[in-house]
Amino acid sequence: MCAPSGPGNKFPDFQAETNEGFISSFYDWIGKDSWAILFSHPRDFTPVCTTELARLVQLAPEFKKRNVKLIGLSCDSADSHSKWADDILALYKMKCVGCDSEKKLPYPIIADEDRSLATELGMMDPDERDEKGNTLTARCVFIIGSDKTLKLSILYPATTGRNFDEILRVVDSLQLTAVKLVATPVDWKDGDDCVVLPTIDDNEAKKLFGEKIHTIDLPSGKHYLRMVPHPK
């Protein structure tokens, strides 16, 4: 197994122990048609990590709507993950008044105690260590498509919590642009206008989008900024 070198490359299959049991094949766990997000955190029972995973409990139904499976990873044991889950769920209930009550985490967490998987996937943070001096995992996010290729990777330092609403927005963009010949502009949200790919000439664009194209006039005189409604 080797780490994915960038978007478009095949994500490695692997086996792993989790708080929900043993996964004999990551590919089989994802399934044929689903997407997946593999996210690592530095350590169980720590403040930033607890806020992150509680937020993911709240957003899990949104990821499920998009056919995206979630799975976490840290170098803690499966037993530690299971005990920590009570804190995560308690914080979720405090932050999400009126939300459906969750009795268990809606995602498994990999127990990578020997750090072998995190090392292979390039998830380790050399600047973060436990009391024994062992390195810890960074806040990494891998988005993997149904074709088992890496679509996006983001690496956050331990001191910066992730914005999972942004991750959800990125999933919307990735899933749309995987099937439609458009790109998503700055601050795009699902339902907003998109841009025509620069690789598509005007004639082909007109065949695809008809009269819906709105070309924005710019000082250069180049007609490259072509907006189209969201292709539902």
From Swiss-Prot:
UniProt domain Thioredoxin: residue ranges: 5-176
Keyword Oxidoreductase: yes
Catalysis performed (reactions): a hydroperoxide + [protein]-dithiol = [protein]-disulfide + an alcohol + H2O
Catalytic-site annotation from UniProt: 49, 49 (cysteine sulfenic acid (-soh) intermediate)
MF terms (GO), sorted A to Z: peroxiredoxin activity
Coiled coil: none
EC number of this enzyme: 1.11.1.-
GO BP term, example: cell redox homeostasis
Pfam families on file: 1-cysPrx_C, AhpC-TSA
Other remarks on this protein: The active site is a conserved redox-active cysteine residue, the peroxidatic cysteine (C(P)), which makes the nucleophilic attack on the peroxide substrate. The peroxide oxidizes the C(P)-SH to cysteine sulfenic acid (C(P)-SOH), which then reacts with another cysteine residue, the resolving cysteine (C(R)), to form a disulfide bridge. The disulfide is subsequently reduced by an appropriate electron donor to complete the catalytic cycle. In this 1-Cys peroxiredoxin, no C(R) is present and C(P) instead forms a disulfide with a cysteine from another protein or with a small thiol molecule.
Family of the protein in this entry: Belongs to the peroxiredoxin family. Prx6 subfamily.
Functional note: Thiol-specific peroxidase that catalyzes the reduction of hydrogen peroxide and organic hydroperoxides to water and alcohols, respectively. Plays a role in cell protection against oxidative stress by detoxifying peroxides.
Protein name, UniProt field: 1-Cys peroxiredoxin
